[in-house]
C-alpha cells in the first residue's frame, strides 16, 4: 500500500507557481500541469492544448479537457512546502506506513499544544516588558508582586515549551502524493482558460476518442482518480501500453518505434513498425505492466544484441537505421557512466540507500544549504545514481 501511495507522487512533482496569490488560479495551473503530464506520459496525447478553446481539426475539445479537470480539482495535492520566502501556497505531506494515521494525529495534537504554549509565552513576555517600562513611583521599588508573578509565569511557560519539544511524538514517514479532497465536484469550463471566467459545468469523465465499453463509472462522492487510472490501463485502451513500450524502446535504442514519444496524435510521427509496437504492447499487458520484464525481454532479443558494425548495403537502403539493422551509437547518460565507473572500480554499493539526505536538512532554502547537502550526501556517494538527492 505504501508503494502505491508513494507512486501518486507523480502528480505532485511537477512545477508550481508557489508565489501565486490567488488560490483558484494556482489550483487551475496545477490541474493543467497534471493533465498535461498524465496525458503525454501515459497516452502520448497533448490534451492540455484544449484548455482555452476548441481546435478546428483536433478531436479533443474543451469539454473533454474539463471532464478530466473535474477529476483533478476534486483531488488534494500534497507537495510539502511552507509559506514564506515568496511561497504563498503551503501544503502538507502524505503520512505513510502502518501507524502513520495515528502518529500524524499525535503530531497534530502536540503541535497545537506547542503553538498554544508559545502564544502564551509571547503574550506573557510582552506583559513583562510593559511592567519593566512602567514609571517607578517615588520611594517605591519597581519590582513589585506583578513583576515577580510575571517572571515566574514566563519561566514556567519556557519550561513547558522545552518539555513539549523534548517529548515530541515520533514523526511518521511522509511522501509527496495526492488524495481525494473530500469535496468532489464536476468542473466548470474556464472561458479562454481564465480561472475567473466560468462557463457551463462538465461532468467528470474520460476522453471520448478512446471508446472503452467497460469504462468504470465515477461516483459523485469520489474524485474519479481511481476510476481514471483503471480506464488508463484498461486492456481495451489502445494507447497506454503502446506508449509505455515505445518509451522503453526509445531508452534502450536511442530512438522510439514512434520517434515522437510524447505525441501519438496526428502531429506526431507514424510508427516505423506497427506490428512490433502492437506485439510489445500485448506482451506488456501479459507481463502485468512490469517494466523489468519488458526490459529483459527486449534486451534478450537478437535486435538489441546486434553489433554497431557498418554494412554498406543496409546503409544504402536505410541510412537512418529506422529498421534497426545495426545497434546505433548513442550517448550514454551521466548516471550510467558514473555507475559503471563505480562498478568497475569495485566501489559500488548495490544495496538500496535507506533514508533521505534532503530530509536531514528539513524545510529550508536549499539555495543556501547546498554545501550542507553535499557534505551530508557523503553516505550516498557509493550507491547507484538513482539514490542521489535531487532538489526540485
Where do the protein language model's features map onto the residues?
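Sequence context surrounding c-type heme c attachment/ligation sites in exported
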Residues: 3-111
Amino acid at each position: 500500500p505504501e508503494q502505491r501511495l508513494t507512486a501518486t507522487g507523480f502528480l505532485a512533482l511537477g512545477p508550481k507557481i508557489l508565489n501565486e496569490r490567488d488560490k483558484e488560479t494556482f489550483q487551475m495551473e496545477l490541474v493543467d500541469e497534471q493533465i498535461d503530464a498524465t496525458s503525454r506520459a501515459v497516452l502520448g496525447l497533448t490534451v492540455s492544448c484544449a484548455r482555452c478553446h476548441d481546435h478546428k481539426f483536433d478531436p479533443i475539445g474543451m469539454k473533454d479537457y474539463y471532464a478530466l479537470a473535474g477529476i483533478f480539482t476534486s483531488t488534494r495535492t500534497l507537495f510539502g512546502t511552507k509559506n514564506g520566502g515568496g511561497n504563498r501556497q503551503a501544503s502538507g505531506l502524505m503520512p505513510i506506513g502502518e501507524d502513520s494515521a495515528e502518529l500524524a494525529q499525535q503530531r497534530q495534537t502536540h503541535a497545537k499544544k506547542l503553538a498554544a504554549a508559545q502564544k502564551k509565552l509571547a503574550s506573557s513576555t510582552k506583559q513583562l516588558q510593559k511592567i519593566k517600562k512602567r514609571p517607578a513611583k517615588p520611594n517605591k521599588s519597581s519590582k513589585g508582586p506583578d513583576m515577580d508573578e510575571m517572571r515566574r509565569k514566563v519561566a514556567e511557560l519556557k519550561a513547558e515549551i522545552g518539555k513539549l519539544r523534548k517529548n515530541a511524538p515520533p514523526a511518521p514517514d511522509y511522501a509527496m502524493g495526492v488524495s481525494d479532497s473530500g469535496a468532489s465536484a464536476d468542473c466548470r469550463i474556464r472561458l479562454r482558460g481564465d480561472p475567473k471566467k466560468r462557463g457551463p459545468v462538465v461532468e467528470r469523465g474520460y476522453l471520448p476518442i478512446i471508446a472503452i465499453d467497460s469504462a468504470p463509472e465515477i461516483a459523485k462522492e469520489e474524485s474519479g482518480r481511481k476510476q481514471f487510472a483503471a480506464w488508463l490501463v484498461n486492456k481495451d485502451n489502445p494507447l497506454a501500453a503502446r506508449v509505455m513500450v515505445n518509451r522503453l524502446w526509445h531508452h534502450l535504442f536511442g530512438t522510439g518505434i514512434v520517434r515522437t514519444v510524447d505525441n501519438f496524435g496526428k502531429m506526431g510521427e507514424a510508427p516505423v513498425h506497427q506490428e512490433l509496437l502492437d506485439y510489445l504492447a500485448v506482451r506488456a499487458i501479459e507481463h502485468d505492466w512490469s517494466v523489468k520484464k519488458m526490459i529483459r525481454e527486449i534486451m534478450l532479443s537478437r535486435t538489441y544484441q546486434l553489433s554497431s558494425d557498418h554494412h554498406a548495403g543496409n546503409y544504402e537502403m536505410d541510412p537512418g537505421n529506422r529498421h534497426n539493422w545495426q545497434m546505433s551509437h548513442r550517448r550514454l547518460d551521466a548516471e550510467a557512466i558514473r555507475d559503471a565507473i563505480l562498478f568497475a572500480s569495485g566501489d559500488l554499493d548495490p544495496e538500496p540507500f535507506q533514508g533521505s539526505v534532503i530530509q536531514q536538512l528539513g524545510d529550508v532554502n536549499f539555495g543556501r544549504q547546498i554545501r550542507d547537502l553535499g557534505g551530508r550526501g557523503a553516505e550516498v556517494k557509493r550507491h547507484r545514481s538513482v539514490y542521489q538527492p535531487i532538489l526540485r
